[in-house]
Amino acid sequence: MLFRSGTLPTDGATGEAEWTGFVPFDQLPHLYDPPSHMIVTANNRPSGAPGAPLIGMDFPTPYRAQRITDLLTTTAAAHKLTPDDFARIQADTVSLHARSLLPRLLAHVQPTAQMDREAVDLLRAWDDDARADSAAAAIFEAWFLRLAPSLAGDQL
């Protein structure tokens, strides 16, 4: 049988594309009382053993889950977590993606036009906080969306 990932339409008229069963519960990704005593997810790809059943194709990058883990770890080291801590962590908008990638991108930029120089100046001064009113965050995201296809080339 041809493997169907679900990323393309299939012919629903014949019944050949129907589900043939479910992944057994014990094969689904799971954690029980991990050493860190916390389980964090931000819709990122669950880690699984090689050969684990396919449970999805499109997952966000792990940056958000990593940021949540970092904030939980540092906050819990300082004091017992409170509902206010969880609210602050939930509302956090710092972009680890930008923090990781932006210094490397800026190292290779030599803007010539005034508007480009202003954009680069905003990015260099940015605190990596992707607040809704952040011009630098908007510039970074637009830049990355234009840049990503050229970095990945035919792999996309």
Positions of predicted regions on the chain:
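Long, compositionally biased non-active-site segments enriched in small/hydrophobic residues and glycine
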Residues: M1-L156
